[in-house]
Amino acid sequence: MLPLGPKKALLEYTLFSSELLERKVYVDAISDFLKNYPTGGYEVLEEEEGKIPMTCYRFDLKNSPTLLHIGTAGGWTKPSTGYTFQRINKKTKELVDFLKQNKPLHKFGKRDRFWFYDLLFIDVLAKDNGSGADLFRRMFEKNAPKTIFNFLDEKSSFQEEFQIMRSFNIKQFLRALLKRIF
């Protein structure tokens, strides 16, 4: 929930799922949340819905020497959060520099440690979808906002990343890592 004023807020419901669910499932989840929230009633002013591919799928493998998929179709959405705007800005700047080098387009982009962090995070959520709220809650409770946003914007230092990782139940992530390795 994001407050927009003293009596107005944006409520977003996010669900990690390999399948789309009926609209009623999402509406019921929001209604259940609001029933337990001490608001004294509410009025829905606007609704929207969307589907964001929160995945570590290798979109880059669909590129060719002369074709480069960009934006969400190019895998530029951050897998663990669904945020796209900041990453498109960053990737666009990188792409401009890359194009100046006259290299084949399929050589653009790379998987880095942040891709790997997202991969493990998505694996943890896929195994236990209900843990998402707790993971984010722990991260925000145990870290300074600047550290969190550096991490989410993929600008963090290893020290900040270690601090973020200490927020979580490390066993969940070790299991995900071991499953990837073996």
Residue ranges and their predicted role:
Residues 5-7, 32-41, 100-103:
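Secondary-structure boundary elements
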Residues 1-26:
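Conserved FAD-binding catalytic core of PHBH/FMO-like flavoproteins
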Residues 93-182:
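C-terminal helical "tail/cap" subdomain of flavin- and related membrane-associated enzymes
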Residues 1-5, 67-68, 104-109:
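Short hydrophobic/aromatic-rich motifs at helix boundaries and adjacent loops
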Residues 17-94:
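FAD/FMN-dependent oxidoreductases across multiple families
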Residues 9, 69-73, 112-116:
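Short acidic (Asp/Glu) and glycine-rich catalytic loops that position anionic groups and cofactors
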